[in-house]
Structure formats: C-alpha cells, structure tokens
Amino acid sequence: KIGFSGFSDLKIEIAKEDFSQKKEHPTSVKYYDEIANNLTEALYSTIRLLDEEKLNEAIKMITQSKNIYIFGVGSSGNTSLDLENMFLRVGVQAKAVLDPHFQSQVASLLTVNDLVIIFSLSGKTKDTYDSLKIAKKNGAKIIAITNYIHSPIGKSADLVLQTAIEEFLNGGSLDGKISQLYICDLLVHGYEQNNNIDSVELREKVLRSIIDKSID
C-alpha cells in the first residue's frame, strides 16, 4: 500500500499532487477566465458523453412512474432539490430526499411502479448506495447520474446518465454542479416535449402562487 491506509487515500494524494502542481505552475490566464474555461469544459465534456438513446429511455421511465424520488447527499443533495423544483414547473411532483436515514425509509416502501433518480459524482456514496440496494430489492427502477459508470452505484442502476469532471477533488465544485444541472435540464425539457406539456400555463400558475405570497 506504499504507506497509504487504503486505495481511497492513494487517490486523494494523487489528486492533491496534481492540484499542487497546477498551483506551483500558474498560467497567465486570469482566475475569472480560468473558472469560465473550467465550467465550459465540464459542460462540453458532459455533452460528449451524452447517450441520446439512454436519455430518451430515462424520460420514458419518468413518464411511466407513479412516484419519483431523488436521492443525493452533500452537494449532490442540493442538485436533488434543484431537480425537484425544475420538475414541479412542468407538472411532475418528484420528491428530493437528502437525509440518508429517510432515504432508507423511503426506499423500503417503494414498488415496481416507482422510480429513484440518484445523484452521486463519485458513484461510491455509501449511504446513497445502501438506499439504492433497498429500492432495487423492492423492484423500483433506478436512474443514476454519476461521473463513473463502473462505480457501485453506476453498475447497480437500471440506467446511467454520465457527467464529466476532470479532477477527483472537484466533486463539490461548481464544475460538477454544472454537469449535473445540464442533465437535469435535458430530463425536464425532454419530458416537457414528449408529453406536450403546456409549460407556459404551468409556470404562470406557479408564478401566480409566488406573487400571492408577496407583501404589497
């Protein structure tokens, strides 16, 4: 193990070394340009990995499901909430579940008519993986949105939509978030088009409910 307690420690050290080398050899690119370049690269890398057939199948699974739950923890949990809100605006009532214990409880009550969408950039988030196994045991369908299709979560899912971030340490970065949100937008707009949803009318209803909450 060369002085490391496990493979995870080795991966982290390699990532840190790569990160340190970039800091020791700065380029002439200004930091705001570098951030923009990183976000653009994350987006286009995800586009290059896109499998249109799998995307259409995922949209079909969403359409046919009775109940939809979205699992994620940490930064992926925040993306789960984003997708819940995006779905609501096209009339899909999905529920984001961020707490690992509650994920397990929800998973234990799922059936073959239900769908779980899982966010995990690493594909190795233990709590989420444990809940996935419970959901699978009960016959629920699983869509995984992850950076690694051969990860435990990726291999256990019925369908994988792949994101792309360059560095191991970027898991909680905006790069990863952009990749995930791009996939979210594809799912929502695809559902909207395939089901002839009048999104203007729905968004008007949502907007009116928000305006009614405002104090004059």
Give the label of every model feature segment.
Residues 53-65:
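Glycine-rich phosphate/diphosphate-binding loops that line cofactor/substrate pockets in enzymes
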Residues 63-182, 186-195:
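Glycine-rich phosphate-binding loops that contact phosphosugars or nucleotide phosphates
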Residues 13, 17, 61, 205-209:
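Short acidic/histidine-centered micro-motifs embedded in hydrophobic/aromatic stretches
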Residues 45-48, 60, 108:
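Surface-exposed charged/polar residues within alpha-helices that form helix-capping/stabilizing sites
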